[in-house]
UniProtKB/Swiss-Prot annotation:
Stated name of the protein: Larval serum protein 1 gamma chain
Species for this entry: Drosophila melanogaster
Tissue expression as described in the entry: Larval hemolymph.
Keywords in alphabetical order: Glycoprotein, Secreted, Signal, Storage protein
Subcellular location: Secreted, Extracellular space
Length: 772
């Protein structure tokens, strides 16, 4: 578990090379009580609250205005809606981007955020847990825990542990919700005799492997082991890459003592109803970490939060958000190349969407998510008025960029052909609360998502759709097609800025002589995700204390990579500080043609950035992918966190505030594209620029357990995100001694190939000796 700060951007990771040593804080009794409350209040979120302590606290919503720092319009409207029975009912689908849902969620968030003390907060949260829609409750609570200053260090389980229904297919969710330990125990006795006969001679299956695995894909690893999609006892440990960090902790034995664990192999979406090439990419687009990253980005920089009040303007929120969009598309494009696909399809207003999508998800109320058929025509089947508004937004933005200035409704004029105008353009594209013209730009973002989800302006009860929540929208290939419109505006803005000159890029006295890179290897490994919130059995309490004695796990194959290293050789003519940036991009397109640098700059992902104190002479810098501070390894699970809190509450464990990876970290395993067995050509670009900032990074927050959202000191310098790839490139000026390109290859290794090569002696059981 890292102690370093995770910087929230996919590539805007601008951190120090050497983070100053700081003692990790240990939670006191007061902190543990608060953490226990947060873990219990979201437990089995789609069921009635069963903790008597919190039921008593949640008898009424505190409406005394004296108990709040502010009591605003949205809070009044929420309270009125509740009294009139007009709140979104419990059990109904909640969409964060449905206008009617958003307004109620805003009011609920304010009841949480503006509470003057912990008791008022607890009473409001407990009341909302009992009376408010489950999805709306989690959305508002997540925002409050992230943004309320006095809650620094407190955490919630990951969103995929609170709502596994948003991340796993309906087949798995049904099985988890029906799980009954007593029935399971009896079934295993009968199944053992059956399996002993079935798997007695594995050689009988080798001649018919094609038929047995006719729809097999890499992530259906369980078929190669003779397993099926059913529940199995896990009598060893939670599978994850960084397992040793936990099992080597002597206290960990106490944590898992008496805990019964059950896992089920789980698959990704595949083409069941209609054929679609895009299903080849579902291991990536449906990756839990990939989707959770986008969710938490939009929680940290929620579009409706005021930048000045929450400090988000200090973090350059608009620029930061649109740059993340650009980087997500760049990373997605790299994965497309690894699978033989080309450019992300363009979005045209009056053209059919070639690829449909069936998420195969089911909401916790039993209603399946809506799907889109191949060659779907939004213009014909959608709501024309909303469609026109979305078109008008983009037309207006292009027009003001072309004219070079923008005049707001109150008469202010802004020059949009200056670099600092990216703040304005980014705010407009996100449609956030800091846009200068709120009459036009504020709600277009909501309307766009509502339109593509077939939701009308005033709809309250709507069908589930992946486009209405941040945690599900990256699953749909159409997300990348539509969001390409956002980056087109971004590139249009950059087009009017002159390319950097050699004088701009040159760092006097610094020369990158060479950078060696270790072999880049990707593979599929297997991991357990905690889905215990799907359990429906009876909860057991002893003396008022909940006994958490069972854990359900979703065991899934996911993309990963071997750790890799850089060794920089950099000459400096004097002692000085510099910022080292590392980018990874493709070399060729899907046809094997070299991609021109000026165009290819859009496809580079920044994977590292750090400050280094150069000495006079030759500097040798060694850096590992494990040191990337913006990424996270596999997280400690919800079940384990609760167990640790209870152990600490009994005085048997020192609970460190940095026990879990920051909520907004990007998954380390997705830094590299899948690659090819013969090696996929890629290229690194290394660039060193001067360090000349007046503020000290991490100076106003504790980096050991806080991500510093809204602090203004999260980033190591004030260069544009993506610098120097953020503008058009003039190749006659771009190549400078302090920049260096390195050709590499990414090799994919099939870790499951051994199951084809020889008899698998453990057929019908999980192979713990599998080498990743």
């Amino acid at each position: 578990m890292k102690l370093t700060l995770v910087i929230l951007a996919l590539v805007a990771c601008v951190t120090a090379f050497s983070v100053p040593t700081q003692k990790v804080k240990i939670a006191d009794k007061n902190f543990l009580e608060k953490q226990k409350f947060l873990f219990e209040i979201v437990h089995r979120i789609d069921e009635p609250l069963m903790f008597e302590e919190w039921i008593k606290m949640g008898q009424k919503l505190i409406t005394d205005k004296a108990q709040y720092e502010t009591f605003d319009f949205y809070m009044e409207k929420l309270w009125e809606s509740y009294k009139l029975g007009a709140l979104l009912p419990k059990g109904e689908f909640f969409g964060a981007l449905v206008k009617t849902h958003h307004k109620q969620a805003y009011g609920l968030f304010n009841f949480f955020y503006y509470a003057k003390d912990w008791e008022t907060f607890v009473r409001n949260v407990a009341w909302a847990r009992i009376h408010v829609n489950e999805g709306m409750f989690v959305y508002a609570l997540t925002l409050a825990v992230i943004h309320k200053p006095e809650f620094e260090g407190l955490i919630l389980p990951q969103i995929y542990e609170i709502f596994p229904q948003y991340f796993f297919n309906s087949k798995f969710v049904y099985a988890a919700e029906k799980f009954d330990y007593e029935v399971f125990s009896k079934l295993t006795m009968y199944e053992k005799e059956y399996k002993d006969i079935l798997y007695k001679d594995y050689s009988e299956f080798t001649g018919n492997f094609y038929f047995y695995t006719k729809d097999w894909k890499t992530w259906q690893w369980y078929k190669m082991m003779g397993l099926d999609q059913e529940w199995y006892v896990e009598d060893k440990y939670f599978l994850r890459e960084n397992l040793s960090q936990f099992v080597n902790d002597p206290k960990y034995v106490d944590v898992v003592k008496g805990l019964k664990k059950f896992y089920m192999p789980v698959d990704y979406t595949r083409d069941i109803d209609f054929f679609n090439d895009e299903t080849k990419m579902t291991y990536f687009t449906e990756d839990l970490g990939w989707n959770a990253y986008w969710y938490y980005l939009n929680m940290d920089y929620a579009f409706f939060l005021n930048g000045k009040q929450f400090g988000l303007d200090k973090d350059r929120r608009g620029e930061y958000w649109i740059y993340n969009v650009q980087q997500i598309l760049a990373r997605y494009y790299q994965e497309r190349l690894a699978n033989g696909f080309g450019e992300i399809p363009e979005f045209f207003w009056y053209k059919q969407i070639e690829y449909g999508y069936d998420p195969q998800l089911i909401y916790y109320n039993g209603i399946g998510y809506s799907y889109r058929k191949n060659y779907y025509d939004f213009y014909t089947y959608g709501k024309f008025e909303m469609y026109s508004q979305i078109q008008n937004f983009f037309s207006r933005v292009y027009k003001v960029l072309e004219t070079g200035f923008y005049k707001t409704a109150d008469g202010q004029v802004f020059d949009l052909h200056k670099p600092e105008a990216i703040k304005i353009v980014g705010n407009y594209l996100q449609g956030n609360a800091d846009t200068f013209d709120k009459y036009f730009f504020n709600y277009y973002y909501l309307l766009a998502h509502m339109y593509f989800a077939d939701v009308d302006y005033n709809d309250m009860e709507v069908f589930p759709n992946v486009f209405l929540n941040f945690e599900t929208m990256l699953r749909d290939p159409f997300f990348y097609t539509f969001y390409k419109k956002f980056t087109d505006v971004f590139y249009t803005f950059k087009y009017y800025l002159k390319p950097y000159t050699q004088k701009d890029l040159f760092y006097e006295g610094i020369t990158i002589k060479d950078v060696s890179v270790s072999k880049l290897v990707t593979y599929y490994d297997i991991v357990d995700f905690d889905v215990t919130n799907l359990l429906n059995d009876k909860m057991t309490f002893v003396d008022g204390q909940y006994i958490w004695d069972k854990a359900l796990l979703a065991r899934q194959a996911r993309l990963n990579h071997k750790p890799f290293n850089f060794e920089f050789t950099i000459d400096s003519d004097k002692v000085q500080k510099g910022v080292v940036r590392v980018f990874l991009g493709p070399k060729f397109d899907e046809y094997g043609r070299v991609i021109p640098l000026d165009y290819n700059r859009k496809n580079f992902v920044q994977i590292d950035s750090f400050v280094y104190p150069f000495i006079a002479g030759t500097n040798t810098i060694k850096r590992s992918s494990k040191e990337f501070s913006w990424t996270a390894e596999d997280r400690i699970t919800y079940t384990e966190l609760y167990k640790y809190v209870m152990l600490a509450s009994e005085g048997k464990y020192d609970f460190p505030l940095d026990i879990s990876e920051p909520h907004n970290a990007f998954p380390d395993r997705l830094v590299l594209p899948k690659g090819w067995e013969q090696g996929m050509p890629m290229q690194f670009y290394f660039f060193v620029s001067p360090f000349a900032e007046t503020y000290e990074q991490f100076s106003n927050f504790d980096y050991t357990y806080s991500s510093g959202v809204g602090s203004g000191t999260r980033f190591v310098d004030t260069k544009p995100f993506g610098y120097p790839f953020d503008r058009q490139i003039d190749e006659s000026d771009f190549f400078v001694p302090n920049g260096f390109f390195k050709d590499v290859k990414v090799y994919y290794v099939d870790t499951f190939a051994k199951y084809f090569e020889k008899k698998y002696t453990q057929f019908g059981t999980f192979d713990y000796s599998i080498e990743y």
